[in-house]
Amino acid sequence: MNVLSCSINKLNGLYDISGVEVGQHFYWKIGGFQVHGQVLITSWVVIAILLGSATLAVRNPQTIPTSGQNFFEYVLEFIRDVSKTQIGEEYGPWVPFIGTMFLFIFVSNWSGALLPWKIIQLPHGELAAPTNDINTTVALALLTSVAYFYAGISKKGLGYFGKYIQPTPILLPINILEDFTKPLSLSFRLFGNILADELVVVVLVSLVPLVVPIPVMFLGLFTSGIQALIFATLAAAYIGESMEGHH
């Protein structure tokens, strides 16, 4: 009995260490609506960082670029290249949208690892990266869906919907289903990767608090940047596809 109770106590201890709570939220009531307060707080912080960086970038441009100006110009050229590669020659109007998506997701992902959110105590739940919440990733994916529908309809008019019966009307249900799976795949891919990364770091810090979590945190920073690039690239690809035709 002593051996059995000892084993049970060990299992309970391991359960307590790895029992990371997911899904608790701090709610705000705005009118008749209930919103996730912690997501709004962290999103506002990310937006403030982006607006502050943009203000610094354009406040005093130099003929001979400074190191900071070179950095922001490099970021802009990178976003332009991604947009042009995926959308084609008509990429220009979509650079702000793709750039906003990429930078918001990139800074949001990195904020989860670099900003000490846990210093701010909430009545329920805790602060984390905005992209750690499924509501944020679904909202970004739905914005992408609206964007590629708008791109297709603005270029082709109602003829855009003809793609659903190409190459044969038999594929109509599959083609319609495809447009529903695009935002789902975008949102769940981003949410799953960011949540899993933060949970792995939290569990490792609980088990081995000093050295072991550091390489995982650096790997998380790398994968966070890759996830932002994947989301922006796929968003641009969907927009380009809606403008060119069904593939």
UniProtKB/Swiss-Prot annotation:
Function field: Key component of the proton channel; it plays a direct role in the translocation of protons across the membrane.
Q: How does it assemble?
A: F-type ATPases have 2 components, CF(1) - the catalytic core - and CF(0) - the membrane proton channel. CF(1) has five subunits: alpha(3), beta(3), gamma(1), delta(1), epsilon(1). CF(0) has four main subunits: a, b, b' and c.
Does the keyword Magnesium feature in the UniProt annotation? no
Q: Which HAMAP family match?
A: ATP_synth_a_bact
Its protein name is ATP synthase subunit a, chloroplastic
> Record's superkingdom?
Eukaryota
A GO molecular-function descriptor: proton-transporting ATP synthase activity, rotational mechanism
Organism lineage string: Eukaryota, Viridiplantae, Streptophyta, Embryophyta, Tracheophyta
* Membrane topology note: Multi-pass membrane protein
* Location of this chain's protein in the cell: Plastid, Chloroplast thylakoid membrane
UniProt keyword annotation of Phosphoprotein present: no
**Record-stated family:** Belongs to the ATPase A chain family.
Q: Which UniProt keywords apply?
A: ATP synthesis, CF(0), Chloroplast, Hydrogen ion transport, Ion transport, Membrane, Plastid, Thylakoid, Transmembrane, Transmembrane helix, Transport
**Does the entry annotate any disulfide bonds, and if so which pairs?**
none
